[in-house]
Amino acid sequence: MKWSEISIHTTEEAVEAVSHILHEAGASGVAIEDPAELTKEREQQYGEIYALNPDEYPAEGVLIKAYFPQTDSLHETIAGVKSSIDVLPSYDIEIGTGNITVNEVNEEDWATAWKKYYHPVQISDTFTIVPTWEEYTPSSPDEKIIELDPGMAFGTGTHPTTTMCIRALEKTVQPGDAIIDVGTGSGVLSIAAAKLGASSVQAYDLDPVAVESAEMNVRLNKTDDIVSVGQNSLLEGIEGPVDLIVANLLAEIILLFPEDAARVVKSGGLFITSGIIAAKEKVISEALEQAGFTIEEVLRMEDWVAIIARNA
């Protein structure tokens, strides 16, 4: 079968939004080529943890590649993707050039091509994320492994926002905590929470593909006795109280439910948010404070922030 590779040149800020647009348009796979991956802060902290070829990355910006079967409606699909991307600046998301190019590829070329971007990565003092197809031996008895098979629909769990969320969980999760993961995606944050000692984790996502991916990864990590995965829109209809809520979502989505988070998390409980570009830190912090939260700590990595807030 012939497939079309749609390449979009954009910014790091727009990666999550553009990836979501491509998934919604029916992409059968998405790969992200971000030159920031070549010089991650974690390389300096943890040594040479992966080897990437600089020639495969753009000189500037981020290249997002998505794969669609060649059909009569492909041109309409691409036009729809372009229209959705062109709207992002109205949400204060900088898209860069937004240039779109199309190339024809064979199925065998793209079906495994995305795996070359995914290697074992130590993202904190505690956790290393390992793809299921690679052998990896922990360097110490205290090192915790999260095995992920993200398929071609979700990221590798090594984006700065995910890394910061996991580091925030390391700081805050207590044995026996009840936790909710809003917008779970691959399920990586729920798995981390379970491995940190949470007694129950509710993982929710609106996307049925995400629910399926998270369920698979939860089973893969043998945390299905702690983590339950379900389809839901944010915190609609969810009752508390829980000790902690974590949400790694776009800032615009986080702004939709601070009040619900304050309702569901117990008094004195925590709300960890990320997916927040640095320019949006103030508006998110203000929304959290208006809902009754107190900002306890802000984590920063590259152009992203994660916020740890405590409920009144």
UniProtKB/Swiss-Prot annotation:
Span-the-membrane segments of this chain are none
The record ties this protein, via InterPro entries, to: Ribosomal_L11_MeTrfase_PrmA (IPR050078), Ribosomal_PrmA_MeTrfase (IPR004498), SAM-dependent_MTases_sf (IPR029063)
Record EC number: 2.1.1.-
Annotated compartments: Cytoplasm
Q: Which CDD domains match?
A: AdoMet_MTases (cd02440)
- Keywords, alphabetical: Cytoplasm, Methyltransferase, S-adenosyl-L-methionine, Transferase
Q: What cellular component GO annotations does this protein have? A: cytoplasm
| Family of the protein in this entry | Belongs to the methyltransferase superfamily. PrmA family.
**Stated name of the protein:** Ribosomal protein L11 methyltransferase
Q: Which organism is it from?
A: Bacillus cereus (strain G9842)
The protein's gene is named: prmA
